[in-house]
Amino acid sequence: MLNKFVLEQLIAFFQKNPVAQGKPTTDDEVLNVEKSLNVKLDDDFKEFTMRFGGCVVRDAQIYGIHNSEFLGEDTIIDLNKEFSDYLKDGKSNLIIGTDGWGNPIYISPSKTVMIYNHDTDELLTLAANFSDYLEKILKKQ
């Protein structure tokens, strides 16, 4: 479950920036994503996408099924099919977005949020879990 601080900050952010928010994902759509990608969605990510859809939060792109217009037409399924070959154990990771340089950001099976730099072939830990990742994004100025 998303922590209270993160949830309150997200609600306030999307009240000020409604165009950055996508359309919430349904239970059936969550099941379809899990089946299509053969992964179990992280609980915090699932709650996020079921509340806010695919969004832009500050400078972070977080994909879902129904994305903000800023993210275009690609869904989280499309994103994972496009980028999973870049990652070791790519099929067991859930790619949730990219940075400004096209590097995939993903949730690992251990729930850690990571980024893969395709130019240097390096992995970097961004946060211990999805809620922490959101909190770091929301605290950026």
Regions found by a protein language model. Name each.
Residues 136-139:
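Metal-dependent nuclease catalytic cores in nucleic-acid-processing enzymes
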Residues 1-105, 141:
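A surface-exposed partner-binding patch
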Residues 123, 127, 131-134:
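Compact, glycine/acidic-enriched structural inserts
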Residues 108-111:
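Short acidic-glycine loop/turn motifs at beta-strand connectors
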Residues 118-122:
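Short, solvent-exposed aromatic-acidic interface loops
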